[in-house]
Amino acid sequence: FFAGTSEIDNTDWVISMGHFMGLLDSNWLGFPANRKMTFLRYADFNCIRNGKLVRSGFFCDLIGVMHQLGIHPLPPQTGASFIYPGPRTHDGILLAPQDPSESTKTLKLVNRMCQDLEDLNVSGDDYPPPSLLAKTWCEDMIWYGPAGIGASYTIPRYQEQHQYPFRSGLKDKVFNGHLCRL
């Protein structure tokens, strides 16, 4: 998880993501029980004001649950499917104060990436060159996409396995803005 102040409206947010695991011993949301371990990938956004939760957003990968049950509502995914790992070095929890200049530099990079992608949406170009993403992404980046898309390694494979099919296959897409930006 991580927390911080949103640059959109100066509100405080706590965010977590991961996998819930349980035994699917009963039918759930119309999905048949499989009596096996079942994993639900999620991301949870919570706005806190005066010590109370005032707004939340919860996103979960129900298509991933369906895949575990042998139900495939979408065409075959183009990327790999597996339980995505945590940080590569497994030292993602930072308990000591960090260099604010490094945080500022990282935030500027993420915001530049978001702006590049927003500009791309406005342009209508569904097949941008790899050099566009290389402005803010490392060549050996890994995309951990949801079920139906899957994971990809390297910018060219990300574009082949996710970006190009997604952009060309999803017409009339609308960006409604960010819930928060930390």
PLM features per residue range, with description:
Residues F1-L182:
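C-terminal and inter-domain tail/linker signature
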